[in-house]
């Protein structure tokens, strides 16, 4: 069976090819219908309004080549940035995250804790509530993001 990339996958790949060096596409998603939202990060500088406007002008032609002519929104991933790739989990070892998995692990789907270790197939999370460790495979993660304690 031949698996074809989804429209969002194709658009994401076009964006990644067009982005300047040192800029990362953290997440792409359709928001509010035809609005394509791109969360981007970059090395050595802020993701401010000027940078986002520049990214739109860079990626718009690449998206048009893929047949997308809708609206584009570019923004920073924020302080509770999504973790969408294994490399993100590696980068944030030692940081607190919130993770949702598709199939229950140890009878639950939602976890909050600190990333302890990362392997090729998954990662180990030290749970906030009891300090226990749970191993979660990357393939089971449906949503994950940094969890900042804003009360400190």
From Swiss-Prot:
Superkingdom, natural source: Bacteria
Gene Ontology CC annotations of this record: cytosol
One of the protein's GO biological processes: ribosomal small subunit assembly
Subcellular location: Cytoplasm
InterPro entries for the chain: Ribosome_maturation_RimP, RimP_C, RimP_C_sf, RimP_N, RimP_N_sf
SUPFAM superfamilies xrefs: YhbC-like, C-terminal domain, YhbC-like, N-terminal domain
Record's keyword terms, sorted: Cytoplasm, Ribosome biogenesis
Claim: Lyase is one of the keywords in the record: no
Residues passing through the membrane, by range: none
Gene3D superfamilies: Ribosome maturation factor RimP, C-terminal domain, RimP-like superfamily, N-terminal
Keyword Cytoplasm assigned: yes
Family affiliation: Belongs to the RimP family.
Function of the protein: Required for maturation of 30S ribosomal subunits.
Listed name of the protein: Ribosome maturation factor RimP
Species annotation: Rubrobacter xylanophilus (strain DSM 9941 / JCM 11954 / NBRC 16129 / PRD-1)
């Amino acid at each position: 069976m031949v698996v074809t990339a989804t429209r969002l996958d194709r658009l994401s790949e076009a964006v990644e090819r067009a982005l300047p060096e040192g800029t990362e596409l953290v997440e792409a998603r359709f928001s509010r219908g035809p609005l394509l939202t791109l969360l981007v990060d970059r090395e050595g500088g802020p993701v401010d309004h000027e940078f986002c406007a520049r990214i739109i002008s860079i990626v718009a032609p690449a998206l048009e080549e893929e047949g997308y002519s809708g609206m584009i929104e570019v923004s920073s991933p924020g302080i509770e940035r999504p973790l969408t790739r294994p490399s993100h989990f590696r980068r944030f070892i030692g940081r607190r995250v919130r993770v949702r998995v598709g199939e229950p692990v140890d009878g639950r789907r939602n976890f909050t804790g600190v990333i302890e270790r990362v392997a090729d197939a998954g990662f180990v999370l030290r749970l906030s509530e009891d300090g226990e460790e749970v191993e979660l495979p990357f393939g089971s993660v449906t949503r994950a993001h940094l969890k900042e304690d804003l009360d400190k």
